[in-house]
Amino acid sequence: MKIAICDDNEAELNRIRELLEIYACDKGQKFFIKCFTSSVELASTAEFEKYDIYFLDIIMPVMDGINLAREIRAFDRFSPVIFLTSSPEFAV
């Protein structure tokens, strides 16, 4: 499974990657995880390199996670997008 993670906070990015690696190991799965600290970089890469699932921070500079998801949806309508944030304004 190819997974893209995008978060401008490197500590959070590494934490998510580590949790996914632990999960993959526990389940006997193989994950290819690519990390991005720039939403613009992921937007330009994802059009040519498809991922099975996207984990996106909501609040990022230049392009937020919501607009990044819109960019991704323009060429990938089916891969799941999971939004992540530590901001209480988006809490459910």
Indicate where each model-derived feature is located.
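Short, flexible, glycine/charge-rich loop motifs used to bind or transfer phosphoryl groups or to couple energy/partner
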Residues: 24, 43-45, 71-72
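Non-catalytic signal-transmission and effector/linker regions of two-component phosphorelay proteins
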Residues: 1-2
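Acidic, metal-coordinating helix/loop segments flanking the phosphotransfer/catalytic sites
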Residues: 35-53
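Alpha-helical elements of the RecA-like P-loop NTPase motor core of helicases
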Residues: 14, 44, 92
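CheY-like receiver
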Residues: 51-92
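Two-component/phosphorelay signaling modules centered on CheY-like receiver
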Residues: 10-34
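Conserved acidic carboxylate
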Residues: 7
